[in-house]
From Swiss-Prot:
Organism, as annotated: Pongo abelii
Protein name (Swiss-Prot/TrEMBL): A disintegrin and metalloproteinase with thrombospondin motifs 4
Subcellular location: Secreted, Extracellular space, Extracellular matrix
SUPFAM superfamilies, alphabetized: Metalloproteases ('zincins'), catalytic domain (SSF55486), TSP-1 type 1 repeat (SSF82895)
Keyword Signal appears in the UniProt entry: yes
Length: 837
């Protein structure tokens, strides 16, 4: 998918394209030269241009017969099931029991509209395991959907795949309950390339603020929706297929490379029929996403604690999705919207089992992840490849050892640390246990080809190496050929005698046990303290630890708890020669960036903007162009250690305002008193207050606020509809800092004064005109009022604190010295002599 937009914030669309290398015979990307060469060679060897036969297999239409069984209390799902079928000249008796390991607990399944191919088996279904003909070495693993069986049988060295035919409905081959049973023998390693087998004649069914810098369990309660095209294509196997895809996506989110404990939980499954007025699904991916996002909100409940509530929704469709100029899009989602009920949604074009990575990719966008080729990611990922991770813009194969790039891990961590994942902290009461078997056990290579390229496609064997890329049969201009989308075989797909695929490699069955046992992670030691973010004035330094002792494996639990700690450093005052505050320096760094305003020539004077900035945005670098008055967020974060505001001693740490004392120590309880003395008792200053009512036209002097004044507050009240007086500030040199030259500032603003001091002004049009600031002033200010009319009912009051004069010690006069001398002599005369006999 290609992401549109350039800002990492919420609201941008993300799209994904499969096939970093060419995808053959598909409109997504052009044909590979290697396959064209293969076709030419085959055409020269085979006059008919038909490729040779694939792996040996046999197929039969069978009619499973339910003999007896019992149901689970309160659910209606079978606890035991005895089933018989005739195949390959033999009677197979399946003795099945309910498998609690893949029980679908807490899953709500809804069928909306008319979908006759599904309604015959619309019960939620259950998973059954057992034996065949009582032989202990045999294995039956099936999904029972009320009238259809789907799964794998392993019997006497053969592997048999059982699935409903035409959704279990009547067809030309037999009566109700018709299934197809395919017997597949192990690959012999010999034989011709492959052959395009005749088609079977029908498609095969198929919160709010979390602790900062802490690793907390997140549960993404997900609504999964399948449209009518999905129902028509997959038939009775749709539900099992969706759960298999979501299980693979959930497995990706469990990988430790994401550096967060994220659990993808499917809580509701909705299947749409042709008669349902659902979302408008069409070729335009953007319009489909907008329609689905609006539609899914109507299914949600507002309370996060409600069992029917979901945190995000994902739509699967067989519709070919298109972007602005091409139809390369396989999915789309808004960025950074996971807890926004109106926009936490994604769409996925079903493309076979690899759709699990499309779903993971789109949900990655919902978690604020960017594409790995974006500018921020290139700097974070370093020289790593941008095409081997889940968030690659165009991808052929996900690295099983590191599916998430460092950039993806960084963005989701920052996103959650900043409180955007508050809705994910509640643990579902009845979690859904997704299928635990490897998908390749339920969907062999032939089935994977059908899911990807259509019902007529089959696996092309003996194209080395096995497991690395799935090659499937197809036709081009009437000629048989093999094609691939470069995705690996699904994990668990048989690839040889007693061998199966895992992570794109063909391994012995004994080695697969290493991938079945979950291993929880453990924290490693704390690392050393890093560099201080400031050289003076109070900086921040960090120390972190990783979940590496051991690293979690196979879906094992990721470490929980504090992963990063921080402390204050370099808290001493900066040199007195510093003219700008730390935030002013950061704004001034953009003064020579002329590309921000194309029509404004020359450098710009950027100053911090405090007024009108929401509390949650205090740690963004919001600066105002002094000449134009416009203000912008120039950086998503200020440098660590920057004060959150002029009126606070708290400091910004990784984009969050963290409490600090006036001594610049994070966590300290020291406060400024009214005199702006750190830890003082307020005795060093006195309050000065007064009012003013002698209004005359023009500028009127009210009071001179002296140097060192603190906690300044000026309030002017009157009839806002007929106001005729306004506050003004005059500097010692005669210039005006506010509302001079009969020019008013109508909106709220920060009045920047010499000495890196600022006062907050409400604006001339405010209902109550105010001017306030903590100080202390570096030079005196003259408070004035500008009278522009009849000042009826106008009232002005002011107050501030001024330092108390230090009492001077008078020099003693000669008389004082004589008096003190007499007192000392009298004391000495009265004392007894030490040692007198």
């Amino acid at each position: 998918m290609s992401q549109t937009g350039s800002h990492p914030g919420r609201g941008l669309a993300g799209r994904w394209l499969w096939g970093a290398q060419p995808c053959l015979l598909l409109p997504i990307v052009p044909l590979s030269w290697l396959v064209w060469l293969l076709l030419l060679l085959l055409a020269s060897l085979l006059p008919s241009a038909r490729l040779a036969s694939p792996l040996p297999r046999e197929e039969e239409i069978v009619f499973p017969e339910k003999l007896n069984g019992s149901v689970l209390p309160g659910s209606g799902a079978p606890a035991r099931l005895l089933c018989r079928l005739q195949a390959f000249g033999e009677t197979l008796l399946l003795e099945l029991e309910h498998d609690s390991g893949v029980q679908v607990e807490g899953l709500t399944v809804q069928y909306l509209g008319q979908a006759p191919e599904l309604l015959g088996g619309a019960e939620p279904g259950t998973y059954l395991t057992g034996t065949i003909n009582g032989e202990p070495e045999s294995v039956a693993s099936l999904h029972w959907d009320g009238g259809a069986l789907l799964g794998v049988l392993q019997y006497r060295g053969a592997e048999l795949h059982l699935q409903p035919l035409e959704g279990g409905t009547p067809n030309s081959a037999g009566g109700p309950g018709a299934h197809i049973l395919r017997r597949k023998s192990p690959a012999s390693g010999q034989g011709p390339m492959c052959n395009v087998k005749a088609p079977l004649g029908s498609p095969s069914p198929r919160p709010r603020r979390a602790k900062r810098f802490a690793s907390l369990s997140r549960f993404v309660e997900t609504l999964v929706v399948a449209d009518d095209k999905m129902a028509a294509f997959h038939g009775a196997g749709l539900k099992r297929y969706l759960l298999t895809v979501m299980a693979a996506a959930a497995k990706a989110f469990k990988h430790p490379s994401i550096r967060n404990p994220v659990s993808l939980v499917v809580t509701r499954l909705v299947i749409l029929g042709s008669g349902e007025e659902g979302p408008q699904v069409g070729p335009s991916a953007a319009q489909t996403l907008r329609s689905f996002c609006a539609w899914q909100r109507g299914l949600n409940t507002p309370e996060d604690s409600d069992p029917d509530h979901f945190d995000t929704a994902i739509l699967f469709t067989r519709q070919d999705l298109c972007g602005v100029s091409t139809c390369d899009t396989l999915g789309m989602a808004d960025v950074g919207t996971v807890c926004d009920p109106a926009r936490s949604c994604a769409i996925v074009e079903d493309d076979g089992l690899q759709s699990a990575y499309t779903a993971a990719h789109e949900l990655g966008h919902v978690f604020n992840m960017l594409h790995d080729n974006s500018k921020p990611c290139i700097s974070l990922n370093g020289p790593l490849s941008t095409s081997r991770h889940v968030m690659a813009p165009v991808m052929a194969h996900v690295d099983p050892e590191e599916p998430w790039s460092p950039c993806s891990a960084r963005f989701i961590t920052d996103f959650l640390d900043n409180g955007y994942g508050h809705c994910l902290l509640d643990k579902p009461e009845a979690p859904l246990h997704l299928p635990v078997t490897f998908p390749g056990k339920d969907y062999d290579a032939d089935r994977q080809c059908q899911l990807t390229f259509g019902p007529d496609s089959r696996h092309c064997p003996q194209l080395p190496p096995p497991c690395a890329a799935l090659w499937c049969s197809g036709h081009l201009n009437g000629h048989a050929m093999c094609q691939t989308k470069h995705s690996p075989w699904a994990d668990g797909t048989p690839c040889g005698p007693a061998q199966a695929c895992m992570g794109g490699r063909c391994l012995h069955m004994d080695q697969l046990q290493d991938f079945n046992i979950p291993q929880a992670g453990g924290w490693g030691p704390w690392g050393p303290w890093g560099d201080c973010s400031r050289t003076c004035g109070g900086g921040v330094q960090f120390s972190s630890r990783d979940c590496t002792r051991p690293v979690p494996r196979n879906g094992g639990k990721y470490c929980e708890g504090r992963r990063t700690r921080f402390r204050s450093c370099n808290t001493e005052d900066c040199p007195t020669g510093s003219v700008l505050t730390f935030r002013e320096e950061q704004c001034a760094a953009y003064n020579h960036c002329t590309d921000l305003f194309k029509s404004f020539p020359g450098p710009m004077d950027w100053v911090p903007r405090y007024t009108g900035v929401a509390p949650q945005d205090q740690c963004k670098l919001t600066c105002q162009a002094r000449a134009l008055g416009y203000y912008y967020v120039l950086e998503p974060r200020v440098v660590d250690g920057t004060p959150c505001s002029p009126d606070s001693s708290s400091v910004c740490v990784q984009g969050r305002c963290i409490h600090a004392g006036c001594d610049r120590i994070i966590g300290s309880k020291k406060k400024f008193d009214k005199c702006m003395v750190c830890g003082g008792d307020g005795s060093g200053c006195s309050k000065q207050s007064g009012s003013f009512r002698k209004f005359r036209y023009g500028y009127n002097n009210v009071v001179t606020i002296p140097t060192g004044a603190t906690h300044i507050l000026v309030r002017q009240q009157g009839n806002p509809g007929h106001r005729s007086i306004y506050l003004a500030l005059k500097l010692p040199d005669g210039s005006y800092a506010l509302n001079g030259e009969y020019t008013l500032m109508p909106s709220p603003t920060d009045v920047v004064l010499p000495g890196a001091i600022s006062l907050r002004y409400s604006g001339a049009t405010a209902a109550s005109e105010t001017l306030s600031g903590h100080g202390p002033l570096a030079q005196p200010l003259t408070l004035q009022v500008l009278v522009a009319g009849n000042p009826q009912d106008a009232r002005l009051r002011y107050s501030f604190f001024v330092p108390r004069p230090t009492p001077s010690t008078p020099h003693p006069t000669p008389q004082d010295w004589l008096h003190r001398r007499a007192q000392i002599l009298e004391i000495l005369r009265r004392r007894p002599w030490v040692g007198r006999k």
